[in-house]
Structures are given as C-alpha cells and as structure tokens.
From Swiss-Prot:
Protein source organism: Methanoculleus marisnigri (strain ATCC 35101 / DSM 1498 / JR1)
Membrane topology, from the record: Multi-pass membrane protein
Predominant location category: membrane
UniProt KW Ligase keyword: no
Name of the featured protein: UPF0391 membrane protein Memar_0049
Keywords: Cell membrane, Membrane, Transmembrane, Transmembrane helix
UniProt record similarity statement: Belongs to the UPF0391 family.
Amino acid sequence: MLGGGLVGLAILFFVLALIFAILGARGVAGMSMSVAKWLVIIFIVLAIISLLL
C-alpha cells in the first residue's frame, strides 16, 4: 500500500477524489475527499500523541 497505514489510505482517497472529479462524479469526489481529510486529521493527532508519550 502507498505509504502504509492512514497516510496511504488518505493518499488513495485523495487520488480517487481527483479521478472522480475529472470524470464528473462530483458527489463521489466530495465523499472521497472528506474521507481523505479525516484520515489525515486522525493521522496527525495520533502522531502528536505518540510523540508526547
């Protein structure tokens, strides 16, 4: 998988969002982009927590 873990999934959903936006499927692109955004936020929070512990 690309990058492994949450970052890989975020990149995957981002690429899917770009592909769907190009193809004109705005609803699917928006949903993929929101999933990617939340995965990145979760990854950042977990990274900060792991640095503090």
